[in-house]
Every structure is written in structure tokens, then in C-alpha cells.
Amino acid sequence: MAERLTLAFMGSPDFSVPALHALHQAGHHIAAVYTQPPRPAGRGHRLTPCPVHRAAEALGLEVRHPALLKNAADEHEAFRALNLDAAVVAAYGLILPRVMLDTPQRGCLNIHASLLPRWRGASPIQNAILAGDTESGVTIMRMEEGLDTGPMLLKRAVPITETTTTPELHDALATAGAEAILHVLETQPDGENQDDALACYAPKLSRADGLLDWSQPAALLARRVRALNPWPGTFSGSLKILAAHAVTEASGIPGTVIGIGDDTLLIACGDGALCLDKVQKPGRPALDAAAFLRGHKLPAGTRLDEHGFS
């Protein structure tokens, strides 16, 4: 390593953990790790620390989890007292006020899970798959007050295939982000301004996004299944659809069963059909199509409605 830097790390979910480990293993001095506060989780609603919090404690690092940063003078002063060369931010979850953005000597550097300016916002991984993009990637940018608008220091592309799922792309981008931030800290590249005319946005997802509309093309629905599992999940009525693929040479009334085999369950769409590979009923284990069909007799014409199959 050319230079040992004093850093703050700011992140919360699994996506951020590889970058924290990479910075620590590279020998940088991580003065403090900022995460979201512990949240109630599980049946007992016990306060549970986030993945970055747990990883930081395992490394023996100081963990801070302020509930807010805006208008929090004590937090701003504590951040300033770290005497940072840079802060590395990866899916932290809180907006950094300008006073904090301006504190580190080299600024606050964000690991964003898209090739900016495409897919600014909260759900870039899912939206890249939903849109049918053939590649995604990570961008290291110097943060400004705008939403993912700062100068870009480095981009690393990652391919998206016709079978790529959100968990697979998430893990590939997390690894790419860890490698990219090490390179940026070592080489200190000049920033390139983003072209706002090319920007598009990835809004926060909700459960409603997972409802499948069978009047849509099968290719689009297959992308929804790949993009929106495990959360918010994809479903039709009470039936969760965990894995599926599109079949183009098929037609029928949208939302009805048009093909059944030993391990094949085809649902007609607005264009083509969706072959359900793995499904789950409420309170039941997930089943592949063959296991599901052994327990459910579904003649052709059976319709998926708000209760599942009818």
C-alpha cells in the first residue's frame, strides 16, 4: 500500500461489508465505523445490529450509530475530531450534511451500485435488471449534497445476463466496489462530472412492486421475478413466485394455466408465457414446479386470482 490513510467508514447492509474488510486488510486506519442504529428483528423483536456493525465489532473497530446527522452539532464535531483523510460511504442510509461532506481532506467517497449517471437512487441493482440492462457496475464518486450527483472517480462494469438475479448481481457489485475503492484511494484520480441529461432514477421499492400483471409480456415478468426476489418478492394473489423464465412460443388468456408437464407450469401472459420454476404458498415451504404439481392438480384453463389458483 502506497499510503496509510485515516478513514471513516459509513455503511449498513451486506453490500458494504466487503469494502470494510478490504480497507481493513489493506492496512488503512479506520478511525470509526458509522452504521444505522440497531433495529428490532425476529419474533422477539430484539434489537439487532446491521451487518456492517457486526463486521466492524469483529474487527475491533469503533462503531457509531447516530439516529440522525442533520442539525446534530455534537455529531459533526465528533466527526471532525477524527482528523480524516477521507470517508468511505457505501449504502449508509443517512444523508450527510454539507458540514460533514466538507470535513475530510479528500472528501467523502461513495461506492454506488450502478454506472452513474444511470440509476441514481435507492434501488439501482433491481432497476438495472428490471430495465433489461446488459451491464451494471459500480461508480466511486466524490459526494455532493445532491442525490448521487458528484464527480465520478472510477467506474467498474459488471455484466448482466438473461439469468442474473438481484442476489447474484448484488454480490458481484459488492466485490467490485471493494476493489474499486482501494484503487481510488491509491491512485487519487481526477473526477469527471456527470452528464445530468443521461441520468435516470431508481426509486425505493415497495411491496406493491412485486404484484405480477399477467397482461404484461412474459419477458418483462421474468425480469421482475429475477429483480425483485428476495424482497419485495413477486407474487400473484397469495402465491409467491420465486423463480421463473419466459417462453416466447406460447399464448393464451393472460393469467391462466396453458401448459402442464411433470416439471412444467406455464402461465399465459400478454405476450408469451411465464414458466414457474419455484413457488411458495402461505405457510408452506418453497417448492420447485415438479414438487408443486405433485400436490396440486391444475387443469389447463385454471386461473391465477387474488387467492392463488382457482
Curated annotation (Swiss-Prot):
Which residues take part in binding (6S)-5,6,7,8-tetrahydrofolate? S114, L115, L116, P117
Q: Per the UniProt record, which EC number(s) apply here? A: 2.1.2.9
Extract one GO cellular component term from the record: cytosol
PROSITE patterns, per database record:
GART
Q: Which residues form the signal peptide?
A: none
Q: What keyword terms does UniProt attach to this protein?
A: Protein biosynthesis, Transferase
Question: Transmembrane helix: is it a keyword of this entry?
Answer: no
| Catalysed reaction equations from the record | L-methionyl-tRNA(fMet) + (6R)-10-formyltetrahydrofolate = N-formyl-L-methionyl-tRNA(fMet) + (6S)-5,6,7,8-tetrahydrofolate + H(+)
GO MF terms here are: methionyl-tRNA formyltransferase activity
Q: Quick check: keyword Acyltransferase in the entry?
A: no
Q: Its biological function?
A: Attaches a formyl group to the free amino group of methionyl-tRNA(fMet). The formyl group appears to play a dual role in the initiator identity of N-formylmethionyl-tRNA by promoting its recognition by IF2 and preventing the misappropriation of this tRNA by the elongation apparatus.
Q: Extract the PANTHER family matched here.
A: METHIONYL-TRNA FORMYLTRANSFERASE, METHIONYL-TRNA FORMYLTRANSFERASE, MITOCHONDRIAL
Which NCBIfam families does this one have?
A: fmt
Task: State what protein this is by name.
Answer: Methionyl-tRNA formyltransferase
